[in-house]
């Protein structure tokens, strides 16, 4: 029986209050959540369908449902009474509200559609479909605006459009529309934020913009005062420039006075700022030049802070800032009207097609629940409401939950230190506000319980995390103080390992190198250097041991124990993957980007671009060099050398005009093809045109023959599907399709290709830190720690913020100049702080993934200079100026006892400061890039040695008796004959379906089958119907992916199939072959009912087993002992207490009710499945079934 900690037990047992459970990383929050639910069911006798359990992903909801089902069955097995009540809970589990916010909203809207006049038959629009609708709505809106000729519109275009186009203004409308969807009442919020611009100087002083600016300036001025205090200390040291003290104290007094003036109206601060006057330093001849320079440097930095405020924040007066805002009011008002106009048109288009998007669902539900009768219905229904991952909520979701909660029935669990989804508009301040205001004692109506014990990581990892984050995370930066409440505490004991210290590898970019190496190093990208060093470390790790509690002993580290975490996978993941493959390390990169970078997609888009406009050099050269153009590099050079002016297409035309060689006629043929395709594009629908290009060029077949051909073909099919969806809109033509695709790219609409990986595959994982959240690994390598933060969010013409509203630049149309408004300046500061806080929490997530070992890797330039900077970075101002993760990590480590190597490198004389948290152990390695080059040179020398031996091999010596030790062996190998020629005809591997076909008695047919190289897509075959085999494949796929907890009706099944179509798992045509009535009948048949109630269900499970050839192939001689591999896929099996149940689905037509004939056809196949399952699981298959969809019947074999 599990032993709960005191805090966990309190979270499980507490009743009569709203609970916020602040659950640290690895603290067992999900287990606590499930146990609380079970105890509510058991002790409070509340049915599971009276609970609302909200998660943030469908996967999390499914896992939660499985965990609850497992916990209920465990309780039933105890036979302590109440089994009937628990059985009832299992039957209710299918309709229990364990759901995402969006799924809950769907339920609310479908139940109460009449209250808001929404078609109950709505479907959720595909992202591409809704993107096209947005584009259409925007184009129509702007066309109407140009026709109206309104002056304010043209002023808006001039202020926020591009130099020659209005695309930036269109993008701004879309950006504002998307942003305000995170508000409960978007249009009201936007209207109020526009009215903020019509303010007086008195209102300006009280505005949130000024409050934010004051907060920022307070941090800056405190930073300046800290620098001056350090300078004063240095000035008074022995040998220090003590004559500087007068000026330093004068500076300090003035800045302190300026700091205190922040408590007054901003006009007072502005006046005080302009009164500051820094006096000159006195001459100091006898002082230590190093101390003198250091002192002057610190003072200059403090002065620069004041200068920055004067020149970049208050370079104009408060009155001028107010005037700017007032003059912007008409533009902001018209911008509001554009956003509303776009919203109305977009909504109309969705209504016409009967679709909604996810934002609609939330706002529809809010409108319904604003009606107290509807809200009261849910208050009465749900005895308790649970919100998982509460730190990732936004204000819309918060408003939804608050509208249906009672006074004391809300349970929220999460960890604000792991709130890393601000880019999805998550709002961690919702968690923080409750964290700071909820009481910790029993009896509070709003109560907070902290789960601080970590059961994932060994103590050395936890100590390191605590040490780093105590030095960097605070209320000002990180949005929460990393104090005793936030720290991690070890929750379980670990067996010792050889080196538990946290390892940090600093790769110095500019370490002194030999001149010979310089050229090679310049060619070696920073990413590749890190990748190679990580690869080398991985190889070394394989010789180390960890303790594995599953085997109750030590074992060697395997590839699958290791994960490489990256802040961004773009460029980095692929580079690491390529290096690992070269080094013989099996690896898998889990990246969400790369679709548009895939060579086949990029090339085909370039072909479309060239057909649309041949005078684009890069796309044209790409197509010509590809298999479609089939030009060699030499031919391309000849064309350009002949004419070095103009576009490359001009050079082609000139070559055709002047030359008479074979290349000319090759070019003529190529141009004719392009012209023909350009003509076709004018008259053929874009999807049909892409189909035609696939056929004309044969490119689809070509990529199918490349490594990863099936994936490449799938990528091209996605492009065809995009064109098919585009064709359904009112926007037509090749140019507009290319424009649409490029808009998807620029709006980060890229998507990674689907990849499948089993958790037991022995490979190193490469993934983003975001993807790793919630996961754990024995060894974690965080790489790219020296990569600079991306803070470009503050560079846009108009910034947006949930609290500060709109932050536009001010443009003077007369002077044709622009400057930042006070609103934009405030938002720049606030967004930077929030972005850095998020980066800090991302680092926390990365550092809390390892169970046994954490290895940190990062590249750094001018390490001595950086170390000195780190040694002085001990306040919020310094941490806010960090450029990357290493700046934060280094700031803490330079003060740690194990940081002596860093202190020596930076020429620092101080000892480590003791702060009670130096229990952490660190190994700090400083590496040079030349290590990699030396290894490469060593490899080259070995290869040259082998080549030299081959070069001087003497054939005459070999013939005349030399090399006798090799000659006999070579002759034996060349003259060798295989002793069992019959075995050559036996295949090494067969599928179960091959075996089934007439029990296989044609050995030669088996041995000489050559599979088709590539598979044509349905759209290229011109099919309008599906074969029986294809229908079966679709039905199997649907059965594999259906959520078994949502199959209560045909409508439930149809909705899930619509979801599969929307996400392009199956096509619209494929979905039509699925008979939902048949599927429903299966789930409610006797065997289907047993399957749905099972504790664990496994679907589409592949297997490979070894069999004697004689057992499988008829007609073989008895003395043949050859083995072969039999592979297959088991449709479904599930666990019951006393064994496994195996089900195989069949869509065969049962003629004249002759079920026995169908069963006979599959007896051998099912016996192989049964044998495979028993051998793989080690458990008995107690029952085997064929489910025949034709007669809606399960038949036991």
Swiss-Prot record:
The keyword Phosphoprotein does not apply. Pfam families: PDDEXK_1, UvrD-helicase, UvrD_C. It comes from the Bacteria. PANTHER family: ATP-DEPENDENT HELICASE_NUCLEASE SUBUNIT A, UVRD / RECB / PCRA DNA HELICASE FAMILY MEMBER. Residues 2-458 form the UvrD-like helicase ATP-binding domain. One of its GO terms (molecular function) is 3'-5' exonuclease activity. GO terms for biological process: double-strand break repair via homologous recombination. It catalyses: Couples ATP hydrolysis with the unwinding of duplex DNA by translocating in the 3'-5' direction; ATP + H2O = ADP + phosphate + H(+). Heterodimer of AddA and AddB/RexB. Keywords: ATP-binding, DNA damage, DNA repair, DNA-binding, Exonuclease, Helicase, Hydrolase, Isomerase, Nuclease, Nucleotide-binding. The heterodimer acts as both an ATP-dependent DNA helicase and an ATP-dependent, dual-direction single-stranded exonuclease. Recognizes the chi site generating a DNA molecule suitable for the initiation of homologous recombination. The AddA nuclease domain is required for chi fragment generation; this subunit has the helicase and 3' -> 5' nuclease activities. ATP binds at residues 23-30. GO terms for cellular component: cytosol; DNA helicase complex. This is ATP-dependent helicase/nuclease subunit A. Residues 485-774 form the UvrD-like helicase C-terminal domain. InterPro entries: AddA, DNA_helicase_UvrD-like_C, DNA_helicase_UvrD/REP, P-loop_NTPase, PDDEXK-like_dom_sf, PDDEXK_AddAB-type, Restrct_endonuc-II-like, UvrD-like_ATP-bd. Its cofactor is Mg(2+). Belongs to the helicase family. AddA subfamily. Its EC number is 3.1.-.-, 5.6.2.4. It comes from Alkaliphilus oremlandii (strain OhILAs) (Clostridium oremlandii (strain OhILAs)). Gene3D superfamilies: 3.90.320.10, P-loop containing nucleotide triphosphate hydrolases.
């Amino acid at each position: 029986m599990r032993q709960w900690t005191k805090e966990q037990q309190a979270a499980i047992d507490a009743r009569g209050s709203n609970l916020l459970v602040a659950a640290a990383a690895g603290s067992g929050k999900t287990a606590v959540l499930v146990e609380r639910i079970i105890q509510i069911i058991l002790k409070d006798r509340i049915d599971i369908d009276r609970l609302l359990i909200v998660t943030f992903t469908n996967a999390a909801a499914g896992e939660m449902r499985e965990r609850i089902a497992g916990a209920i069955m465990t309780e039933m097995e105890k036979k302590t009474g109440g089994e009937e009540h628990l059985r009832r809970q299992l039957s209710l589990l299918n309709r229990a509200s364990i759901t995402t916010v969006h799924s809950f909203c769907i339920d609310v809207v479908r139940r109460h559609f009449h209250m808001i006049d929404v078609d109950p038959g709505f479907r959720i629009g595909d992202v591409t479909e809704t993107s096209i609708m947005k584009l259409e709505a925007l184009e129509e809106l702007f066309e109407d605006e140009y026709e109206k000729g309104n002056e304010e519109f043209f002023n808006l275009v001039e202020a926020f459009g591009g130099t020659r186009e209005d695309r930036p203004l269109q993008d701004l409308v879309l950006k504002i529309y998307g942003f305000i969807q995170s508000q409960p009442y978007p249009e009201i919020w936007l209207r109020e934020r526009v009215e903020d611009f019509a303010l007086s100087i008195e209102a300006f002083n009280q505005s949130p913009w000024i409050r934010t600016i004051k907060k920022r300036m307070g941090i800056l001025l405190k930073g300046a005062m800290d620098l001056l205090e350090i300078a004063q200390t240095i000035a008074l040291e022995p040998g220090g420039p003590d004559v500087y003290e007068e000026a330093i104290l004068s500076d300090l007094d003035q800045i302190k006075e300026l700091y205190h003036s922040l408590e007054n109206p901003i006009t007072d601060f502005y006046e005080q700022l302009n009164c500051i006057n820094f006096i000159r330093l006195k001459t100091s001849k006898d002082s230590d030049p190093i101390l003198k320079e250091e002192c002057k440097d610190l003072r200059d930095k403090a002065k620069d802070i004041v200068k920055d405020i004067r020149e970049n924040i208050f370079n104009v007066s408060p009155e001028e800032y107010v005037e700017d805002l007032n003059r912007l009011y008409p533009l902001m008002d018209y911008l509001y009207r554009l956003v509303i106009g776009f919203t109305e048109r977009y909504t109309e288009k969705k209504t016409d097609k009967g679709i909604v998007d996810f934002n609609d669902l939330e706002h529809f539900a809010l409108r319904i629940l604003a009606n107290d009768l509807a809200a009261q219905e849910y208050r009465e229904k749900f005895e308790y409401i649970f919100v998982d991952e509460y730190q990732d909520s936004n204000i819309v979701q918060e408003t939804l939950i608050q509208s249906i909660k009672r006074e004391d029935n809300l349970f929220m669990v999460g960890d604000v230190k792991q709130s890393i989804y601000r880019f999805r508009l998550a709002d961690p301040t919702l968690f923080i506000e409750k964290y700071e205001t909820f009481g910790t004692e029993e009896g509070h109506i709003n109560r907070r319980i902290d789960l601080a014990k970590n059961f994932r990581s060994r103590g050395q990892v936890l100590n390191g995390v605590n040490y780093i984050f105590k030095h960097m995370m605070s209320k000002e930066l990180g949005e929460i103080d990393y104090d005793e409440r936030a720290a991690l505490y070890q929750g379980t004991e670990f067996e010792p390992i050889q080196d538990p210290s946290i390892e940090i590898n600093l790769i110095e970019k500019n370490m002194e190198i030999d001149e010979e190496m310089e050229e090679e190093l310049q060619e070696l990208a920073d990413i590749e250097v890190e990748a190679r060093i990580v690869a080398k470390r991985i190889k070394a790790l394989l010789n180390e041991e960890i303790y594995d509690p599953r085997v109750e002993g030590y074992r060697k580290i395997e590839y699958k124990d290791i994960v490489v975490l990256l802040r961004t996978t773009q460029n980095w993941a692929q580079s690491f993957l390529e290096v690992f493959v070269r080094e013989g390390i099996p690896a898998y990169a889990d990246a969400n980007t790369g679709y548009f970078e895939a060579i086949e997609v990029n090339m085909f888009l370039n072909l479309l671009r060239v057909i649309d406009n041949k005078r684009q050099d890069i796309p044209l050269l790409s197509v010509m060099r590809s298999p479609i153009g089939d030009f060699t590099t030499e031919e391309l050079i000849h064309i350009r050398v002949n004419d070095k002016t103009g576009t490359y297409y001009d050079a082609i035309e000139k070559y055709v005009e002047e030359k008479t060689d074979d290349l000319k006629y090759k070019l003529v043929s190529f141009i004719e093809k392009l012209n023909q395709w350009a003509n076709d594009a004018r008259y053929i629908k874009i999807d049909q045109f892409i189909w035609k290009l696939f056929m004309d060029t044969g490119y689809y077949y070509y990529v199918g023959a490349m490594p990863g051909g099936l994936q490449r073909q799938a990528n091209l099919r996605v492009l065809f599907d995009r064109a098919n969806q585009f064709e359904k809109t009112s926007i037509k033509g090749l140019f507009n399709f290319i424009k649409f695709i490029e808009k998807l790219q620029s709006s980060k609409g890229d998507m990674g290709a689907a990849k499948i990986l089993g958790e037991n595959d022995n490979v190193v994982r490469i993934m983003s830190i975001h993807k790793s959240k919630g996961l754990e690994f024995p060894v974690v390598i965080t790489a790219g720690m020296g990569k600079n933060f991306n803070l470009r969010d503050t560079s846009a013409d108009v910034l947006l913020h949930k609290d500060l509203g709109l932050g536009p630049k001010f443009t003077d149309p007369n002077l044709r100049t622009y400057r930042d408004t006070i609103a934009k300046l405030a938002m720049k500061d606030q967004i930077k702080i929030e972005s850095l806080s998020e980066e800090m929490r991302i680092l926390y997530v990365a550092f809390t993934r390892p169970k046994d070992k954490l290895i940190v890797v990062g590249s750094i330039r001018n390490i001595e200079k950086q170390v000195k900077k780190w040694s002085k970075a001990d306040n919020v101002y310094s941490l806010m100026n960090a450029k990357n993760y290493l700046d934060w990590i280094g700031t803490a480590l330079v003060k740690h006892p194990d940081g002596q190597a860093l202190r020596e490198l930076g020429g620092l004389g101080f000892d480590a400061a003791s702060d009670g948290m130096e229990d952490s152990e660190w190994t700090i390695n400083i590496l040079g890039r030349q290590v990699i080059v030396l290894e490469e040179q060593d490899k080259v020398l070995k290869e040259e040695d082998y080549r030299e031996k081959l070069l001087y091999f003497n054939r005459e010596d070999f013939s005349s008796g030399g090399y006798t030790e090799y000659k006999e062996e070579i002759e034996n190998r060349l003259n060798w004959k295989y002793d069992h020629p019959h075995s050559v005809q036996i295949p090494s591997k067969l599928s179960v379906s091959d075996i089934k076909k007439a029990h296989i008695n044609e050995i030669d047919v088996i041995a000489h089958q050559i599979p088709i190289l590539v598979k044509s897509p349905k759209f290229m075959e011109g099919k309008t119907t599906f074969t029986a085999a294809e229908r079966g494949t679709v039905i199997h796929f649907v059965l594999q992916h259906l959520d078994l907890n949502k199959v209560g009706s045909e409508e439930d099944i149809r909705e899930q199939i619509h979801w599969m179509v929307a996400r392009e798992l199956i096509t619209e045509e494929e979905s039509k072959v699925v008979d939902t009535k048949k599927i429903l009948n299966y789930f409610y048949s006797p065997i289907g009912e047993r399957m749905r109630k099972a504790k664990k269900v496994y679907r589409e499970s592949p297997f490979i087993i070894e069999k004697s050839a004689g057992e499988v192939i008829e007609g073989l001689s008895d003395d043949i002992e050859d083995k072969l591999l039999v592979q297959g896929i088991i449709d479904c099996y599930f666990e019951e207490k006393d064994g496994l149940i195996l089900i195989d689905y069949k869509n065969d037509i049962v003629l004249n009710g002759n079920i026995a004939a169908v069963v006979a056809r599959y007896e051998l196949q099912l016996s192989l499945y049964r044998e495979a399952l028993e051998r793989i699981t080690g458990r008995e298959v107690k029952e085997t079934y064929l489910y025949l969809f034709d007669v809606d019947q399960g038949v036991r074999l």
